[in-house]
A protein has these predicted regions:
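Short Pro/Gly-enriched beta-strand edge/turn motifs at strand-loop
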Residues: 7, 149-152, 286-291
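Short coil/turn segments at secondary-structure boundaries
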Residues: 118-123, 153-155, 226, 288
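Contiguous alpha-helical scaffold segments within structured protein domains
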Residues: 74-106, 129, 178-278, 346-349
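Non-catalytic accessory segments adjacent to catalytic cores
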Residues: 27-136, 192-193, 198-201, 218-223, ...
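C-terminus-biased signal that marks the final domain/tail of proteins
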Residues: 2-28, 33-38, 42-53, 65, ...
Length: 349
């Protein structure tokens, strides 16, 4: 039986037919899905007085965050967005970049062994063969990742991106701010089976320490909450909430000290960013950037852009990354990125 289209579905179909910018998203543990429609094709860049949906690249020093202006908005419930079981073409993952990625890991290990840094996160993209329905993939992610921020956005001058991220970068009100130090990944079948090794615990500790120090550099007094294991779809992560009174510090300044964290860049942050820029041959673009709703610079709910795909000129790319530390094995690091890619490929294929 054909599922009846919601007003949101109808509005989006009409908007897409005009090739106009739009974004659709749902927050963690929320049944509500929001659609934001922009009525012109212009590229709008966010400032400290903006209201709308913000999308920022990984390297936000070289490009301002993009803003989707809410000229029209629609709401629907996740459960009303239609069938997610419709079969689609199996996603094929290319293995052609293995030697290149292993060579990058070797170079990173040389720098780590020389004590230039402790950890660096290396990312790569995987081009996927075949045609995929982005709206169907978005609905599947909503179904599979109820504890994640799931978003799909499209701009005719930039392309289309889809992500499902468990990692909050920053939530603010006028008086308070909150961030999450998240690291470590486990793919066991239940919470009871999760056993964290020293590597994952140490990596999470680095993230917490970095975010705590960064907030203290602004004169804030962060409160570090207990460490916990959280689930996002088929994966588990170590997470620790950090909160503080905002003390009048503006949104841009808070973001500047929190992004990018060691979880997506490395440790120490400056050395890791320098290595990423020298080693990675492909621009990360919006992968490992951040996105979410902002309201006139006072209130924001932003997430790190992880588990994502992009569409541009009929090319589909999937993005993955992995943290390199002393003792990392290049072959195993390659396999880890392939495993992360397969989790996403199996979901959408």
């Amino acid at each position: 039986m054909e599922v009846k289209k919601t007003p949101l579905d109808i509005a989006l179909e009409d908007h897409r037919s005009k090739d106009l910018p739009w974004v659709c998203f749902s927050l963690p543990h929320q049944n509500e899905v929001k659609l934001v429609l922009q009525s012109t094709q212009e590229l709008i860049y966010a400032d400290d007085q903006s209201t709308g949906f913000l999308v920022a690249p990984f390297d936000n020093a070289s490009q301002k965050p993009l803003l989707f202006r809410p000229d029209a908005q629609w709401d629907a419930r996740r459960s009303l967005l239609g069938d997610v079981t419709k079969p689609i073409q199996q996603m094929a993952l290319s293995k052609s970049a293995r030697k290149d990625h292993e060579a990058l890991v070797e170079q990173a290990l040389q720098a780590i062994n020389a004590q230039a840094l402790t950890k660096v996160v290396l990312a790569r993209s995987i081009e996927c063969e075949g045609a995929y329905d982005p709206w169907l993939l978005f609905r599947r992610m909503l179904h599979t990742y109820p504890a994640a921020m799931v978003a799909i956005w499209s701009h005719p001058k930039v392309g289309m991106w889809l992500c499902a991220t468990p990692e909050r970068l920053l939530r603010t009100s006028k008086q308070l701010m909150e961030t999450v130090a998240l690291a470590g990944t486990s793919s066991v079948s239940s919470l009871e089976e999760v056993v964290w090794g020293e590597k994952e615990i140490q990596e999470q500790r680095w993230v917490t320490q970095d975010l705590d120090n960064s907030l203290r550099s602004l004169g804030l007094s962060p409160v570090i909450h207990p460490l916990e294991t959280i689930q996002a779809g088929p994966l588990f992560h170590l997470a620790q909430t950090i909160s503080a009174e905002r003390d009048g510090i503006d949104l841009d300044k808070l973001i500047s000290v929190l992004h990018p964290s060691p979880a997506i860049a490395g440790w120490p942050r400056a050395a890791a960013l320098k290595m990423i820029r020298s080693l990675e041959t492909e621009d990360r673009a919006f992968y490992a950037g951040y996105l979410g709703w902002i309201d006139s610079g006072n209130q924001a709910d932003l997430y790190v852009t992880l588990r994502c795909l992009s569409w541009k000129n009929d090319r589909v790319k999937l993005y993955v990354g992995g943290g390199i530390v002393a003792g990392s094995n290049p072959a195993l690091e390659w396999e880890e990125t392939q495993a992360k890619a397969r989790v996403l490929a199996q979901l959408i294929g």
